[in-house]
Amino acid sequence: SAASDVYKRQFIGYEAHSMEHGDHVALNYDLDAPLVECTSIEDWKQKAKGHKVFITPHHMGYQGGYRGYNWKCFTEGDQTPFVEMYSRHGLAESDQGDYPYLHDMGPRQWEGTIQYGLELGNKFGIMASTDQHSGYPGSYGDGRIGVLAPSLTRDAIWDALRTRHVCAATGDKILIDFRLNDAFMGDVVRGNSRRIYVNVTGESCIDYVDIIKNGQILARMNGPLTPVAPEGDTVRCKVKMDFGWNREEQYVHWQGKLSLDKGKLHGVTPCFRGAAFTSPQEGETEFHTHVNRIVSVNDKETELDMYSSKNPNTTTAAMQAVILDVEMPKDGKIIAEFNGKKFEHTLGELLEGSRSHFMIGWLSEAILFNRAMPESCFTVEHYMEDKEPQRDTDYYYVRARQRDGQWAVSYTHLTLPTILRV
């Protein structure tokens, strides 16, 4: 069954804290792997040798000595093939840029970051993970790992993790094909001339794609400020549909469907969030997780069952969403039927801009038909050669950023660094 297939691809993990070495997460191959009794992170690593486990630095950018990462304890190899660049705590690429650390554990600083570790000459893959504290693994916007594997078996996924064929993303499934002299992300290769190929497919309009070399931008490819509607009648687009907002404390239960009256629905990507707080809350002994589901999908419609809560503040989103991959004529309609209400817009309207609707009235829950994104705005392809070695070992990585703030790294959000040994 589909459920058993998903179970077969799961790995068990747990977290350990350390003021001296920084927090780490263990990811075990064996589902019955025991908790390791240890006195320090270094003791943990020693006791874990010989076992199929990855020990990964977590929320790295905090101050050293206060659960920020201590690069002096990094050991390259199969036990720590990758490090975490992004999680719900924020972005640890550097001490600049998007997603600063806002947790009460303190600010983001330079010595714990990814770029600091790369400048020390360390070699590692880059990933992201949610650290979601309300029982919702993969919560949208809190971080996810991408894996380049030949199949979705546990062994193939594990081997791809071990060989650093991974990348990081904040939320959207931004696909990055990054090659250097035919090597893939995470590989170490030799050569003076470097053929660089990058192909990025986003879920929304791309802001820019950077190729980073030794901490500096080697090349930047910019996306459009405003997507341009393509010529012709039939268009391939991605349209994000958001559900949420409102002022009330109670959850809104969304039941209904999204459908097309013309054209074809190629796919539906979930953007489902867990609760935007640590659970259980003070005074509570348990917390009920509201599970969001894509109930069904065919080439014309998708049925959804979702729960949204009000946004806890003006900078933290709690909406639920899906992204529709559609191919349809401009006069074709995208129809939303939820909780007894029906709203519809043509693709032509959505190519001009977004449209929103309150379900009951002002300050009630709402549906947002986001601007339709044609292929030209969410795809970037670039080829170049770099013939100037700068160090004994130069490092490269790619980062992609969408205009909606989503990243991946190999960086978009964040892209995995591919490292070249000269």
Locate predicted features:
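Extended, charged catalytic domains and RNA/DNA-binding interfaces, predominantly
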Residues: 1-414
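A short, hydrophobic C-terminal helix/tail in secreted or cell-surface proteins
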Residues: 415-422
